[in-house]
């Protein structure tokens, strides 16, 4: 931050907030309220995050559902200090590709860029997406499995259907416009899990292809981002 007022802002974000109130924000770090009593840094984080939003003069704070409690904390801070309160928009969380889906209020298995093989990155090309999805976890009886979550929250709203195209030796192509019927078809064996994965992979790339194309000739930018994030 270039602003010499930043740390003053952090202190103002901390003032008049109790420890119990700060604990209620800990889902932003994938922790429960009682897990950070031996980690003082955890209590700093909500104030730092709130200060960032104010210093950047953000009008709309956008994040996953795991950010909701921290954003509500930020809005309380704004009200106490008579600062502008940003609007907050929160999206569903997608489970990481390697593990089973969890409840919406549990973020232990969320997709995260900190593990690129466990997540779909916006600049992934078609082959990367297919490889990651092929290796991903699919519990056929669990509609919260990562593959089903991607279908529900990304593909169905954007494309309106999942197109399954198995090897002709094993079946005929099929289209699914209803999420639950798609899940049921995989669960009862009508669709082979691998065919379901590849259908989701192809549909996901169709959604993300414009972004992938945008970054295809900006390798210097990608390398700069990777150098900051530590991605090789």
Predicted regions and their residues:
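Divalent-metal (Mg2+/Mn2+/Ca2+)-assisted nucleotide/phosphate chemistry catalytic cores
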Residues: 1-90
């Amino acid at each position: 931050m270039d602003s010499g007022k930043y740390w003053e802002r952090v202190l103002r974000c901390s003032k008049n907030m109790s420890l119990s109130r700060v604990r209620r924000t800990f889902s932003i770090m994938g922790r429960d309220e009682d897990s950070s009593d031996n980690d003082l840094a955890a209590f700093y984080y909500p104030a730092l995050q709130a200060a960032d939003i104010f210093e950047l003069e953000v009008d709309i704070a956008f994040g996953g559902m795991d950010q909701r409690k921290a954003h509500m904390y930020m809005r309380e801070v704004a009200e106490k200090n008579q600062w502008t309160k940003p609007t907050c928009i929160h999206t569903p969380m997608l489970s990481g590709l390697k593990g089973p889906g969890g409840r919406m209020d549990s973020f232990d298995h969320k997709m995260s860029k900190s593990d690129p093989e466990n997540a779909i990155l916006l600049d992934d090309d078609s082959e990367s997406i297919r490889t990651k999805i092929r290796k991903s976890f699919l519990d056929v009886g669990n509609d919260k499995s990562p593959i089903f979550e991607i279908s529900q929250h990304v593909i169905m709203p954007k494309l309106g259907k999942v197109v399954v195209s198995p090897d002709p030796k094993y079946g005929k192509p099929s289209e699914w416009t209803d999420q639950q019927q798609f899940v049921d078809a995989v669960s009862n064996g009508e669709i082979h899990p691998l065919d379901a994965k590849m259908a989701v992979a192809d549909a996901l790339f169709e959604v993300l292809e414009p972004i992938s194309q945008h970054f295809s000739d900006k390798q210097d930018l990608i390398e700069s981002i990777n150098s900051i994030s530590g991605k090789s």
